[in-house]
């Protein structure tokens, strides 16, 4: 989509951590790009075929807590199931008192030979430098992960 956003996502310098900024014309798109950016820290999502799917539902009172739970759930799927997400993610963000994400992630079981390895493994999500805001016509989601 075109809306003036600078990119889908980008990385910033941060020692022992990775600062991720994800962008979207909608808040949903920014959350999807935040997920793709997380995966790209470790492997190439463009090499992941959408062979399998996982349904994810997370909720929280505010957007920052929702982002934390969303990214944390993706880390769990990779750690526990070796589920590598592709760029295909169907995500719906609902506001009903609090916030809820209902998403279907498409991907495959991670294979270093098929999906590559950047040399970095994300250990944990943090609240450090977290920011979610609308900038003109697009949304920016920023967060830091420990590597």
UniProtKB/Swiss-Prot annotation:
Q: Which Pfam families match?
A: Archease (PF01951)
Q: Which InterPro entries match?
A: Archease, Archease_arc, Archease_dom, Archease_dom_sf
What is a single molecular function from GO for this protein? calcium ion binding
Assigned keywords, A-Z:
Calcium, Metal-binding, tRNA processing
Q: Which residues form a coiled coil?
A: none
List, in alphabetical order, the GO biological process terms annotated in this UniProt record.
Answer: tRNA splicing, via endonucleolytic cleavage and ligation
Residues holding Ca(2+): 17, 146-147
**What family does this belong to?**
Belongs to the archease family.
Q: What does the protein in this record do? A: Activates the tRNA-splicing ligase complex by facilitating the enzymatic turnover of catalytic subunit RtcB. Acts by promoting the guanylylation of RtcB, a key intermediate step in tRNA ligation. Can also alter the NTP specificity of RtcB such that ATP, dGTP or ITP is used efficiently.
Please give the PANTHER family that the UniProt record associates with this protein.
Answer: ARCHEASE, PROTEIN ARCHEASE
* Name of the featured protein: Protein archease
């Amino acid at each position: 989509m075109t809306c003036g956003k600078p990119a889908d996502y980008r990385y910033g310098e941060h020692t022992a951590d990775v600062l991720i900024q994800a962008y979207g014309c909608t808040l949903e798109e920014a959350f999807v790009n935040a997920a793709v950016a997380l995966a790209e820290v470790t492997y190439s999502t463009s090499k992941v075929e959408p062979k399998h799917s996982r349904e994810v539902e997370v909720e929280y009172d505010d957007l920052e807590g929702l982002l934390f739970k969303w990214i944390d759930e993706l880390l769990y799927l990779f750690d526990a199931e070796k589920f590598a997400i592709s760029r295909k993610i169907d995500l719906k963000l609902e506001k009903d008192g609090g916030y809820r994400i209902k998403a279907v992630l498409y991907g495959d079981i991670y294979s270093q030979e098929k999906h590559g390895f950047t040399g970095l493994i994300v250990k944990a999500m943090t609240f450090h430098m977290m920011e979610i805001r609308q900038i003109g016509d697009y949304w920016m989601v920023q967060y830091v992960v420990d590597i």
